[in-house]
Amino acid sequence: MKLIIFAAISVAFMSFDQVLGSMLHGVKSEEAMMIADGSVVKPIDHGGPTTEPDGCQVCIAYNWGCSACQRKKNGK
């Protein structure tokens, strides 16, 4: 009988501890979200192309060479 009472008290204490820990973790998460609410992510300049690509978007995508793109390459 004593073992059953001890087990019931232990289970109740563990449940209370989990609930209390969950509530405290929720408060910490809200504080962290309020702190991180500002501009955390900043744009990165990846040094993309500075000149216009040779050809239209279709030719670039499929590695084609339409007549307009060929004239542009040849300077005509």
Swiss-Prot record:
Induction of expression: Expression is induced during host infection.
GO cellular component term of the entry, any: extracellular region
Compartment(s) of residence: Secreted; Host cell; Host cytoplasm; Host nucleus
Stretch forming the signal peptide: 1-21
Principal location class: secreted
Keyword Secreted: yes
Family recorded in the similarity comment: Belongs to the CPGH1 family.
Biological role: Rust effector delivered into infected tissues to modulate host functions and contribute to pathogen virulence. Enhances leaf colonization by the bacteria Pseudomonas syringae and the oomycete Hyaloperonospora arabidopsidis pathogens in an Arabidopsis thaliana infection model.
Name of this protein: Candidate secreted effector protein MPL124497
Species for this entry: Melampsora larici-populina (strain 98AG31 / pathotype 3-4-7) (Poplar leaf rust fungus)
